[in-house]
Amino acid sequence: LLLAAVMVLSMAACAAAPATTPADTPAPAEETQTTEPAETTEAPAEETPAAEPENLTATQQIIKEAEGMTLEELAKKAIEESNGKMFYGVGNSSRGKSALPLFIEYLQSIDSSYNMEFEWQQPKNNKIFDQLTADSLKGTGTFAMTLIQDGNQIESKMVQTGILDTFIPKDWADANGTTADAYTGFLPLQTLNKVFMYNCVGDKTYDNCWDFVAEGEHGLYMDIDSEIVGKNFLYMLTRDDYAAWLKESFEALSADEQAYFQPTIAEMESEAADLGLGADGAYALAWIKLWVESYNAQTDDGPICNTLVDASAKDQFGLLVYSKLRSVEESSSVSVNNIKVAAYEDGYQGIGGYGYCHYLFVTDNSPLPWTACAFIAYMTCTADGFSAWGKDMGGYSSNPKVAEETEATFHHSIGGMAEDGTTVEFAAKNDRGYDWWTTNGKLVLEDPEYCADVAFTVGSWIEMLTKYSAG
């Protein structure tokens, strides 16, 4: 029950979005609602029943029906719709390609004659939005569904424009103690975390999140203009609760350390007021400014991890996907034990990293909407469906039942233990899990609605900062 409660709270953060039907476009919808009464003298009673159904596209009508069905009922609809056909999916994660064969096997367990060909595409360099936009111009699209990240662009480019539709599986809603009608937000497959890690071969330690923006520090980080979820992290720091975390961790610094940061914080007071931020907004802007002007931009988290776990990376740190530790190959100079996860260390103060979601959507012009809904339900409501992601540490299912089954199968919480079960071999690989990371670990969770709200204010301010250049 506790895990379910935590999950629902996190949905309000990592998956929160306006309860806007994708068919609605912001301004025209409002104009229609406000001008209609002026143009007619008919009683309002006649308008009310007609409004709701007309707002639903054909795919949204299917989704509405599908949200009342169990996975098995959806599976039967999928079998009728897609037997012998071709299924195209597109996503930021390549693992959809691994999940689809398992989904097909599941459908074959219901009807042994079922067969479906598939292709899964993973566009690079944030091109997924362009690809989905182009596909939306067709009467019937190529892509049946998508697995996509970056809540800010999803909200502004995909949902408000009616390109993508949210489907909330009944079994997922039940597991989270809610209903499709009551839940407002996007459907997250999982939350991923990027965490502060530092090379510990030397004596240097980082025991406060302000240490990462101290004088002379240059953390390894994927550039905020190449992976936009990293920019969303900075947006989120300006929200009142996360800004308060930064103030709190600042106050835990020594007087000398505070003295270094104080001028920047003071300088940001007027900026925070201009941007309409809360009482602690200056602390957030100061941290963001110091971070953007100091991080050493990298192209991918894999190379960052490879750098940090090498003994030669003494005194370096990075902010990167936690799960990258899974693929470290131990050698005389390379080891997971050459790094520490900052938030796992006793006495660490402040944010431990940030969390962002992979969201699932049906395309509004989906050629196979029932099959898309069934596939989405399979991934979010069964441990087998989530296993393509769940087999590795650092990816947390949004379904508490699936999360529990995943841990029971893969034992990520003791992933760093030796075979005897008592010796800690690699402390950093003992994944403390979603519940810990979103409480004690102080993970900053992406909120798509908040990011979209501040993208033109805080976002424009960030654009004016001068990035650090290692060259």
Protein language model regions, located:
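Paired acidic/hydrophobic, glycine-rich loop segments that form the ligand-binding mouth/hinge
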Residues: 140-149, 314-322
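N-terminal low-complexity, Pro/Thr/Ser-rich intrinsically disordered segments
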Residues: 30-82, 265
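Extracytoplasmic/periplasmic substrate-binding proteins
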Residues: 282-283, 293-365
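Short, polar/charged alpha-helical segment
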Residues: 52, 71-79, 93-115, 196, ...
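Mature extracytoplasmic/periplasmic domains
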Residues: 358-442
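Extracytoplasmic ligand-binding site segments that recognize negatively charged/polar headgroups
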Residues: 85-105, 118-131, 141-306
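Bacterial lipoprotein signal-peptidase II cleavage site
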Residues: 12-25
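Conserved C-terminal helix/tail region of periplasmic/extracytoplasmic solute-binding proteins
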Residues: 52-54, 58-67, 72, 423-471
